[in-house]
Every structure is written in C-alpha cells, then in structure tokens.
Amino acid sequence: MGENLAGRAAVVTGGASGIGEACAVRLAADGAAVVVADLNAGAAAAVAGRIGGRAVEVDLAADFDAAALADQADILVNCAGLQHVAPVHEFPPEMFRLILAVMLEAPFRLARAALPHMYEQGFGRIVNISSVHGLRASPFKSAYVAAKHGLEGLSKVIALEGGGRGVTSNTICPAYVRTPLVEKQIADQARIHGISEDRVVEEIMLTEPAIKRLIEPSEVPELVAYLCSAPASFANGSSYVLDGGWSAR
C-alpha cells in the first residue's frame, strides 16, 4: 500500500458493505479520494468516515443522477449487486428487471457519465466486479447470471473504445465471497433444496472450486488496486478470475 493513487477520485458503488466496502478501504489506503455510493446511507457514511471519503446515498435501480455521481471520477468500481434465487418459471419479472437495472444498466450509465472526463485527461480505470457467474451459469439464478454476462460484454466494449485514450476496463470474477449477499444466498438455497446451510456451502457452493473455502472480501480489492494503478496500463478488456479453479474445469 502507498500513495500511488494520490490525487485520483474513485467512485465505488455498493461501497457500504462486502466487496465494495473492502474496495473503498483499499483504494483510500492507496491515496484515492473515495466516494462510497450505496443505497444504505448510514452504512455508507460509516465507511466514508472511517476512510476519509464521501458518502452518497443512491438507488441504482431508480432514475439517479449518474453525472453528479461519476462525471469527475478517475476510477469507477461497479460493485453494487443483489440476488434472487428461483427457477425461471417462478422468477418474478419485477425482480429480474430490478437486478438488471442495478447490475447492468447502472454500470453502463455510470461509465457513460465518467468516460468524457477520463478521455479528456487521458486516464481512467473502470473495474467491474463481475462473478464466475459472468462466465458460467448455475440453476435458479437467471437474472444474476444474465446481468453478469452482460457486464462482461459491456466491459469489453468500453475496453475497446477507451484503450487508445488511456482508459482501461476490466472485470474481476470471484467465486463465492463471504458477503451479506452470499449469506442470504446460503439461506435461500437451503430453503429451496431443503437442506442445512452448512450443506449448501459444502455441496453447492464449494463443489466446483479446487480450493474449498469462501473468498474473504479483503482478497478481491488487491486485484482492484492493481488494475487501478499505473503499472496496469496494458491490462485491458480482460476478465480476471478468482474462483479457486472453478473455471479450469
């Protein structure tokens, strides 16, 4: 850790908890001025206060002001997400729309707002927190898998458009991370399958990775910090997988 991001402004969505919180803390440790953007205003304020950042309450599913949030960002980390577990024939259409709005449309709108400033200065870093489910599918997660696959495509298009102008765009694709979102999934999967939560972790979440554990939130931001750094200027348009060997199958 150091001050290699001093003078840079970073926006982290979903920054009040889980991976987003860990990313906000890590980027601040590298000297960035971090905006912690989250639906939970109190939690965002707590994180921002701890790292000397600024909290912004935002509902990414609504008609939020993307320019006000991101048009001066040098670094954009799209991390906000939610999950709903149900078979396709029972999946509520309104929940499908909500998940795509937060996890695909909002990253598009924020990138669209941030890119003119990034292009003007010849520097920008967009890191999209995707998932192994941006590369693979699992039953009962149609909206989440669709949103993450879409985010992979969006990130690559931005990479192609921005690469020659000093702007890079990449995704990070973790397996299951020990976050509130995953804890809720464990409970939902236990209900759907009629098994204990411990069995969900062992028999559903950890069957594919060769490394049999959940990822800790603090592990993901180390890669985020690298991708935001000057030495990562040639890292562009890629999907960086942190899945313990899942996608090696």
Task: State where each predicted segment sits.
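Residue(s) in the substrate-gating loop at a strand-loop-helix junction
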Residues: 131
